Amino acid sequence: SVERLCRQIRANGAAPVLFATWAYQKGGTKLTDKGWDYDERARALSEAYHKAAQENNALIADVGQRFYKWSDPQALYAADGIHPSELGSRIAAETIAAAIQAHKENEL
């Protein structure tokens, strides 16, 4: 569980960071085959990750929201519509790094 993982991370002297992922690609077959709406899935994922982060006093790297707000989100996905493209991976890494950096700056 998130709670257990966060506890283990803190026990080892680190701060837990939740990697909030993205919804399947808008208009992609993985999303439509399940009958899901892109906006609803993106919102539900974001809410769930934020709730888990708040309940466990964890940092959040909200990559899903970065994908959602990107001007051309199609470019962020690999051909399968699930995994990130090279650009999507770079955005994810930047988001994680920013969350960690902000935490470090707040500790000073």
Label every PLM stretch briefly.
Residues 1-108:
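Alpha-helical cap/lid subdomain in secreted, periplasmic
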